[in-house]
């Protein structure tokens, strides 16, 4: 029997730091994203700092390398990112709390502004039931369109 729902943020709550830059750097190292994407991301970040209301444009620029990539392929990349790179950033206290709440019958939901391209793999690495995150659009062909948060 469900005893309620608990909501958690991801970046700086369940894991140390912001996750989008480590994901981009992982994709560059694995040759999924070109190195020039880092320059594009830096420019997008500066633009976002100057105009915070344009966060979706900054994310679109940062993640534009996804355009045309298969959602299934990127799910495999997301799994590898968490497994190979990001698990050490998970806060042990946060994981302990998740397990405690789960044992009490709570449903656990992570709500994050981070993109779903990698956040959708998170339930495989944490005891959570769902993730609500920034949507990266996938077309009818199962490939990313390059649109983020639209």
Regions found by a protein language model. Give the residues of each.
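Helix-loop "lid/cap" segments that line or gate small-molecule binding pockets
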Residues: 45-50, 57-67
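Active-site neighborhood of HAD-like aspartate-dependent phosphohydrolases
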Residues: 1-50
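Glycine-/proline-rich flexible loop or hinge segments
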Residues: 43-44, 56-60, 77-82
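Acidic catalytic patch
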Residues: 67-77
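C-terminal cap/substrate-recognition subdomain and adjoining C-terminal extension
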Residues: 1-3, 76, 83-150
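Hydrophobic alpha-helical segments typical of transmembrane helices
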Residues: 61-62, 73, 118
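Acidic/polar active-site rim loop that often engages polyanionic ligands
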Residues: 20, 58-59, 141-146
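Short coil/turn segments at secondary-structure boundaries
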Residues: 37-41, 57, 92
């Amino acid at each position: 029997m469900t005893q309620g729902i608990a909501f958690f943020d991801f970046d700086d709550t369940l894991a140390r730091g912001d996750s989008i830059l480590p994901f981009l750097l992982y994709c560059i190292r694995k040759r999924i994203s070109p190195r020039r994407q880092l320059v594009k991301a830096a420019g997008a970040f500066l633009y976002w700092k100057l105009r915070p209301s344009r966060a979706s444009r900054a994310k679109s620029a940062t993640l534009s390398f996804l355009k045309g990539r298969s959602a299934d392929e990127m799910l495999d990349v997301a799994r590898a990112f968490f497994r190979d790179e990001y698990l050490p950033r998970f806060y042990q206290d946060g994981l302990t709390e998740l397990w405690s709440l789960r044992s009490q019958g709570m449903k656990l939901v992570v709500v994050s502004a981070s993109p779903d391209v990698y956040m959708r793999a998170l339930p495989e690495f944490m005891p959570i039931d769902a993730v609500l995150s920034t949507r990266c659009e996938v077309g009818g062909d199962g490939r990313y369109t390059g649109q983020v948060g639209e």
